[in-house]
Amino acid sequence: MKLRALLVGVALTGLASPARALAPELVPYAAYARGPAGQHLLASVREALCVAAGRCDSLRLVAPDWPAPPRPLFVTLAHGRRTRACLGSEQARGTLTETARRVAAEAMVADRRHAPVAAEELDSLRVLVAFTGGDQALSDPYAVDPMREGLRIETERGTVAFLPGEARTIAWALGEARRIGVLAALADARFIRFEAVVLAGPAVLSTPRRSVSTSTPEVQP
């Protein structure tokens, strides 16, 4: 299942959420993201974007595989605080490298809220890779602390997700969900609170064919 989502805020500004214990299923992903594996994953995503944009000719970079049972994965391209494109996958689509490559390539062209991303735009964009977990269904979206917790809104019209720190208020998140056509009546929606581990860095390879990214990823939380 593909998910369209808004992933901005803490991931785009670099602001850290208050310290808190991660959901157990995300602990291995936090360790993965903070180590060399996170650098490899960001490099493989950058390469996939490069190939999708027609600026590289082949996929060669491979990251270590899923460090634990697969989690939903999102890839976002952003310019400052503005989301340029974002797509996610609830299910693994092969290895972690294969899944991230496919989602990254699709994010370039398949986010129906935005025009396709042009190759030359990558030079000014940042890429974010997010793993989510700790899902908890809620009857009241206002029970979410938007600065510390993520909110996913699911309806028959689609899905929108907000990372921890993206929505300053839940009212804003609900308004944004309505604006993009996902949400109508609250009673028709399913609300899920979640946590996220996010890697972020430039969207372009500093050296197209290096086996390891030369820039250190930013990791939240």
Regions found by a protein language model. Give the residues of each.
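Basic nucleic-acid-binding interfaces
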Residues: 22-221
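N-terminal signal peptide c-region/cleavage motif recognized by signal peptidases
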Residues: 16-18
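Bacterial N-terminal signal peptides
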Residues: 6-14
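Positively charged n-region of N-terminal signal peptides that target proteins for export
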Residues: 1-4
